[in-house]
Amino acid sequence: MSTLGSFIWSIADQLRGPYRPNQYGNVILPFTILRRLDCILEPDRETVRDLAAAYENPNRLRIQVKKATGRPFYNTSKYSFANLLKDADGLEDNLVDYVDRFSPDVDVFEYFDFKKEIIALEKAGLLREIVKSFGAVDLHPDVVSNADMGDAFEYIIRKFNEAANETSGDHYTPRDAIRLLVDLLFAEKDADLTEAGIVRTLYDPTAGTGGMLALAEEHLLAQNPDARLSLYGQEYNPQSYAICKSDLLAKGHDASNIAFGNTLTDDAFKGRQFDFCMSNPPYGVDWKQYAKAVTKERDEAGPYGRFAPGLPATSDGQMLFLLHLAHKMRAPEDGGGRAGIVMNGSPLFNGAAESGPSNIRRWLLESDLVEAIVALPTNMFFNTGIATYIWILDNNKHPDRKGLVQLIDGTSFWTKMRKNLGSKGREISDTDRAQILRLYADFTDADPDFSKVLRNDEFGYWTITVERPLLDECGKPVVDRKAKPKPDSKKRDTENVPFTYGGSTAGPAGKAEVIQSYFDTEVKPHVPDAWIDWAKVKTGYEIPFTRHFYKYVPPRPLAEIDADLDKQVAKILDLLREVEG
């Protein structure tokens, strides 16, 4: 996957003994970042030291450094990898001084608790060798591109997570999946993105190490070198946050746009909206510890709050991020926004009518926010083989797509990898990606075997409660004081009635007529004494993705099966004769 990543990880062999394998990343990751920044800063080190001597005010210094070097960050220490080893006795103190003298926006090493690791390495007698090993690797962007550096981080993090046996729900997003998501996200806006000097904002509330942000920028600049994409993100894992922030720093972005913290309980960009939003939240990871704060926000924010439509079960927080993204899209009156999110299959169908998940789907569909859902191949992620889906949201749809949702079955568009990377044995090649994008672009003209376009109301249904009378010992209905038959709770049943039953296109407005028609046709002929409890009718929405792409495979003819059985029986009899003979 990454020759550089493999080489850097091999440095961890020096840590054997004092460190366990699941602790290697605590050393390797911050040293990799430090060396990358060290190489970037090297050409202007003397200039920055002179400026630091002339300007004591940090804000003035930052402005002058930006003017002189073009970079928003700097380091004023007299030490670097070039001279750290010259003072063997002072290595620990000098390295700490070097880390301490980065500009205030370079706070990434605090999130690794890096000083503690420096002290531990010195005590173990390993610090000199580690510094020497990293000093021998040139990580300057002219030598190692941002893409290659991203691959190296991806490799190191995967090795670290394998050793640490990280939570299965926390998945590093492979680059082939990100590229597809980015292409789909920008697909409807490609014409706009070629305008001269455009400025667009992109936001990832689960930024991880910044892979999505980096590839989105790469995509935009490939289309329009003069475009400027302002990147924003938030990340709760300290190490991932540090990597993401340092990567953006290295590229010259405003590091203050990357925030540390829990997006669900403390939105660092509250009140902000963005042109493009994207996320790959953890799958099936519970949010019980945040439930109190999330519920409080839902109750206090009112009907327009981000969690107002509903809350999913505390066992899986994916749909909270889905709601969050929907509220982060730029308002339609300001040009609208688009969002892309990768999730597993649960958000498509989990939860009964009027449950939290169903109400979230209802809000998204009745608000006409869901533009497309793409099923990805299985075995796409490094530590899980589960089925995953890309949801594309748009609050300002193209007129042809209004009121419609496109489902794309991309499960067969994959290429086998030469070598598995954990659970990842498949990748979406450029050709595979182009085929999926063609299906998206063709829309209603796309191959129906792989693409379906449905009205929003086709995902809706009503759950009706069907009652039957309670009978006395003589078999007669028991009635209440108003002479109405009492229901028998043991015979109570429920039925799901699609909005579209009987060819209805009225959607929610057809409730009474469609339900009555369904009841008269599907229920009454079988249980003539039944009735509907109209007070218990519930509205639900689900997206039965696989059902829409189900292909009936008829069973083999009986004669063919019998012939096969006869052949097998004959073989067994021949073997028995050989044994007896």
Model region roles, listed by residue range:
Residues 290, 382-472:
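Flexible, glycine-/basic-rich loop-and-beta segments that form/coincide
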Residues 273-274, 316-318, 334-344, 370-371, ...:
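Active-site lining segments that contact anionic ligands and/or coordinate catalytic metals
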Residues 168-279, 283-296, 319, 344-346, ...:
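Conserved S-adenosyl-L-methionine
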Residues 286, 290-315:
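Conserved catalytic motifs of ABC-family nucleotide-binding domains
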